[in-house]
């Protein structure tokens, strides 16, 4: 259930995941070497590094799902403490987040990048289809200092949508010729 008590619109999430998959594939296919080396608007990354970071957001979603399932079953205080511990590590997290995208772009570029996203989104589709509706309403606390799209608490359904919002936000920062 969504926070409004309505069933989760799974088809909308599926459609949005497919939109992202097609968009990244198109961006990578049309970006030349000079495009990928160009700085982005509002980040310290190049376009190539930001493209990896955008795809990596969906890998993060895959790792967050079991955490939300687990903490969604535990008393609220456990999730609140876990989020507080993560929040205390916000500064090192931002450094690792930045450097991880610098390094990730060295490995995942060209056709490897959309192939990785294809595999990840296919896994997210399968998981979303398998989630019982009650599980989609489970929630946990998040370290809000880590990402502007993290909220104090998020449901499993909101975590699926997080990757899409993260992607769309960063897409506006690309400085590719056709973006």
Predicted feature residues:
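Extreme N-terminal tail/first-helix region
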Residues: 1-18
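Charge-dense, helix-prone N-terminal extensions
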Residues: 2-3, 126, 130
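A short, structured beta-strand-centered segment in the mid-to-C-terminal lobe
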Residues: 16, 105-117
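Hydrophobic alpha-helical core bundles mediating ligand binding, dimerization, or RNAP-core interactions
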Residues: 17, 21-24, 117, 121-124, ...
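Short, Lys/Arg-rich amphipathic segments at extreme N-termini
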Residues: 20-36, 171
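Short, contiguous alpha-helical
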Residues: 38-90, 122, 129-130, 134-179
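Histidine-centered catalytic/metal-coordination loop motif
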Residues: 90-96
């Amino acid at each position: 259930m969504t926070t409004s008590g309505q069933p989760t619109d799974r088809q909308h999430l599926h459609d949005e995941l497919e939109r992202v998959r097609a968009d990244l594939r198109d961006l990578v296919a049309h970006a030349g070497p000079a495009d990928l080396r160009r700085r982005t608007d509002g980040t310290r990354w190049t376009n190539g590094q930001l493209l990896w970071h955008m795809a990596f957001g969906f890998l993060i979603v895959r790792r967050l799902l079991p955490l939300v399932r687990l903490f969604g079953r535990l008393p609220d205080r456990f999730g609140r403490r876990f989020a507080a511990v993560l929040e205390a590590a916000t500064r090192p997290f931002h450094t690792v987040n930045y450097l991880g995208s610098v390094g990730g772009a060295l490995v995942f570029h060209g056709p490897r990048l959309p192939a990785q996203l294809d595999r990840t989104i296919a896994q997210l589709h399968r998981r979303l289809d398998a989630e019982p509706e009650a599980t989609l309403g489970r929630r946990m606390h998040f370290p809000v200092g880590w990402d502007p799209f993290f909220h104090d608490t998020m449901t499993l359904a909101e975590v699926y949508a997080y990757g899409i919002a993260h992607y769309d936000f960063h897409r506006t920062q690309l400085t590719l010729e056709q973006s």
